[in-house]
Structure formats: C-alpha cells, structure tokens
C-alpha cells in the first residue's frame, strides 16, 4: 500500500494508545534551517509530554512514511528540492520515488490510511485573496469534507481571505470549532474580528463531539482552532500591514500556485524581524499539546 509505519507508531495503534499525526511542510517549506528542525523535534516532544505518540509524515523513496526517526527528521530539514504534496500529486511522488513533504491535505490522507484520527499543524490553507478571479483555493478545504481526521490548528493562515475560507468550510459541511473562545483565530493573532461557528471549552468536549459526528456516519474531518498563547501573539491589526505588503509583492513578482504561501511567509518573517517565526513556532507547539490531550480523550 506504499505505506511504512514506524514501529513505535504501529505498536501504539495496535495497542489502542493515542497517536498524533504531524505534517512535514512546516519543516521543508514553512521555516528556515535550523529553526525548522528545532520545531519538528519540539512538536514531537510536546506530543510525547501529552501522553501520545508523534507520527511525523513525509514521502521518502517512493513510500509514505508515517513516523520519522530523528535522523530522518534531521535529513529532511536540510533536504533540497522537496516536493510540496497535496492530494493531486501524492501518487506522483510515490510513483517517481521523489522526496515529498505533506501538506495538511496529504497528511490527512496518510493519517487516515494508518488509522490516526488526530493531526496537529500550524495553520490550515484556505481561500486565497482574489480567489474570485484566480480560483486559488487550497485543497485542504476539500480534504476536510472527505477525510475523517480532526485537525488542530491556530486557524487559517492569516494571509488568506478568512471570511471566504469560513464560508467555504460551511458550504462543505465542515465543523469549525474554536477552543475556549468565541472568535475565529488568525494564526499569528488570537483574534480576527470573525465569530467562530462553534465553541467548545475542553478536550473532552471536543472528543465527544468527534465521536458523535463519526458515529452518525458524517464522514469528513473537523477544524479545531486553538488560539496562539497571548504572550506569543502578534495583534491582528499589526500583522495586517505586514501581510498586505507581502501579498502585494507576491502579486507584483508574479508568484503563483504552491509557491505563494512559502514566499509570503518567508517575507513576513523578514518584515517582522523574526517575530512571526517565533510566534509560528509557539503556536505549533501549543497545537501539538492540545492534539495530544484530544487524542488521549478519544481513546
């Protein structure tokens, strides 16, 4: 099945112990080296501290690897020409034996194949600005509607059109749950000015929600929005200036498709003097902690 499950992950799944999936584009496309490696290791540590087993996912040598060794993490963090994989090109990477990092969509697919129901990431993809003319909409949103894996995130990446992203998720019947807040978080910022569709206040409540959803045969995932810790956030009004500048540059330089998000994120790191990178690392760790709690309650 082109799937290789790490022995520790396999034992945990067979023993009905909690497992949390982790994506790999945050390593290869989301952060520079060596911060990417430090973050990858930290995310796995946070999951372990929460009583779950981490399963970082990537495509290596034509195989979907569910769970990476520390040596593999280190190698991936420094690898060049790594493909950024979604549903459409996951088979291509396997068939041609390429190296590929999994986006939210591809990680959900791999997690589902392995029997993992909880996945922690930084922020999800969504509807890009200007999508009414470009039709640039992340495949992540369709994956939420079809694959039964719950994703813990800090909301959608704030570089996106957040109102349209929420509308799209509603249209596709995807539950969007804000953890302990009435507001839809905006990645680097706790607030976006948008009301969250649903609110739940404990991991146990979220786990119960997921159990009910899936018991009703309502296939598809759920977006669990976990606001960045207050001490680590950059307020939305402040981030908006940096985002607008980076988005305008990307348009001016003709950057399109899968290159857009990595370019804008890297440019925002420069514009914020590294603050956005530190916030990104903090929110990812915060999401890993919540995902571990949630996975424990789902057992």
Swiss-Prot record:
Catalytic activity, reaction form? D-ribose 5-phosphate + uracil = psi-UMP + H2O
Catalytic site residues?
23 (proton donor), 157 (nucleophile)
Q: Which domain of life is it from?
A: Bacteria
Q: Name one GO molecular function term.
A: pseudouridylate synthase activity
Q: What Pfam family does this protein match (any one)? A: Indigoidine_A
A Gene Ontology annotation in the biological process aspect, one of them, is:
nucleobase catabolic process
Q: Any one cellular component term from GO for this entry?
A: cytoplasm
Q: EC number(s) in its UniProt entry? A: 4.2.1.70
Q: How is the cofactor bound?
A: Binds 1 Mn(2+) ion per subunit.
Keywords attached to this Swiss-Prot or TrEMBL record, sorted alphabetically, are: Glycosidase, Hydrolase, Lyase, Manganese, Metal-binding
What are the binding positions for Mn(2+) in this chain?
136
Q: Which residues bind substrate?
A: 84, 104, 138-140
Cofactor dependence is on: Mn(2+)
Coiled-coil region: none
Q: What InterPro entries does the record point to? A: Indigdn_synthA-like, PsuG
Kindly give the HAMAP family that the UniProt entry links to this protein.
PsiMP_glycosidase (MF_01876)
* Family as reported in the entry's similarity comment: Belongs to the pseudouridine-5'-phosphate glycosidase family.
Question: What does this protein do, in the record's words?
Answer: Catalyzes the reversible cleavage of pseudouridine 5'-phosphate (PsiMP) to ribose 5-phosphate and uracil. Functions biologically in the cleavage direction, as part of a pseudouridine degradation pathway.
How does the annotation summarize its subunit structure? Homotrimer.
Q: What is this protein called?
A: Pseudouridine-5'-phosphate glycosidase
In its UniProt entry, the species of origin is given as Solibacter usitatus (strain Ellin6076)
């Amino acid at each position: 099945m082109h799937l290789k499950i790490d022995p520790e992950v396999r034992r945990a799944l067979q023993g009905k112990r909690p497992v949390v999936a982790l994506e790999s584009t945050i390593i290869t496309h989301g952060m520079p080296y060596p911060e990417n490696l430090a973050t990858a290791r930290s995310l796995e540590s946070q999951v372990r501290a929460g009583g779950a087993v981490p399963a970082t996912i990537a495509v290596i040598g034509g195989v979907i690897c569910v769970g990476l060794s520390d040596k593999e993490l280190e190698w991936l963090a420094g690898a060049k020409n790594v493909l950024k994989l979604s549903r459409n090109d996951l088979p291509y990477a396997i068939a041609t034996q390429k190296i590929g990092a999994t986006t939210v969509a591809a990680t959900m697919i791999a997690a589902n194949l392995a029997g993992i129901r909880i996945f922690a990431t930084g922020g999800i993809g969504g509807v890009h600005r200007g999508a009414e003319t470009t039709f640039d909409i992340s495949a992540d949103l369709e994956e939420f509607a079809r694959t039964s894996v719950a994703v813990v995130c800090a909301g959608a990446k704030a570089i996106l059109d957040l109102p349209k992203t929420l509308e799209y998720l509603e249209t596709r019947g995807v539950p969007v749950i804000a953890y302990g807040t009435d507001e839809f978080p905006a990645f680097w910022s706790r607030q976006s000015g948008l009301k969250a569709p649903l609110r739940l206040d404990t991991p146990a409540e979220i786990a119960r929600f997921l159990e009910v959803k899936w018991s009703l045969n309502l296939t598809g995932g759920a977006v669990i929005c976990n606001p960045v810790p207050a001490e680590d956030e950059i307020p939305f009004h402040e981030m908006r200036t940096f985002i607008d500048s980076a988005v305008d540059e990307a348009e001016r330089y003709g950057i399109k498709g899968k290159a857009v998000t990595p370019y804008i994120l890297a440019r925002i790191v420069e514009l914020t003097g590294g603050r956005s990178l530190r916030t990104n690392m903090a929110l990812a760790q915060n999401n890993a902690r919540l995902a571990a709690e949630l996975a424990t309650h789902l057992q």
